[in-house]
Amino acid sequence: MYPLTRDFPKPLLKVAGRPVLDYLMQQLLECPYLEGVYVVTNARFFNHFCLWKEGWDLHTGRRGIEMKVYNNGVKYDHSRLGALRDLAFVLDQFASLERAVVAAGDNIFCFPLSPIWQRFIFGNVNYVIALFETDKDRLRRTGIVELGPDDRVIRFYEKPNEPLSFWISPAIYFLQRSALMRVKEYLSFSSMHDAPGYFLEYLVNKEPVYAVRVKGRVLDIGSIDSYRNADRMLSVEPFRLSE
């Protein structure tokens, strides 16, 4: 994404006139009983996210939702923690956390999250999202799930060279407390700290994880081309939660 992200964080790049992360925030604010939104970033971009947060303070305050931006202290790319160690860093800020939605900041999820959230908070089950995809190049660039009875996830593959399923699972995971407690367990032996999908590969062998099949699409802002395509697409067809 260089040079666009040389001095600016990718989740705050504007797509159709709005920061990428705004789309996720809009969806989260539609979720009942949401208690908090927590963003972790590095020291370089901490002030960028703090300014972005100010634009949401009124909306979250009205709903009684706590919102914080955490600085992981990292100043240079070569010392980056990776997404999973960032997650562990945030989890350390809480004495207890019953459940959480863990999401990448550079994806736009073009389908409502609230129905999945409501199923999640009124149960004791871990969920991922499954979208049908036949394009092999796209299948190789994301998480893939193999589904069993009742849509339980039998296997999770992070960016496989040879996809064994047509169900993609984007980087948004609905995790109960028992699953969140396994993040440090995973990090204690694995060197795969970056993509959170590697943790899901581990988790599905330890705890039940189920897929929610949805219709829609995910815009992954992973390259300049995908960024421009997302901007063009959402400029023509505005984002709507009801789709």
Model-identified regions with their sequence ranges:
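Catalytic-core segments of class I nucleotidyltransferases/pyrophosphorylases
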Residues: 117-121, 152-220, 224-242
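Conserved N-terminal catalytic core of the sugar/cofactor nucleotidyltransferase
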Residues: 14, 18-102, 113-115
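Short glycine-enriched, charge-decorated loop/helix-capping segments at active-site entrances
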Residues: 7-12, 74-76, 187-189
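A short acidic, often aromatic-flanked loop/helix-cap motif at beta-alpha or helix-coil junctions
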Residues: 72-79, 137, 162, 218-220
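Short acidic-glycine loop/turn motifs at beta-strand connectors
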Residues: 146-152
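The conserved acidic donor/metal-binding loop of glycosyltransferases
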Residues: 105-108
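Conserved donor-nucleotide/metal-binding helix-loop-beta segment in metal-dependent transferases, i.e.
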Residues: 111-140
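N-terminal nucleotide-binding beta1-loop-alpha1 segment
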Residues: 1-7, 12, 27, 66, ...
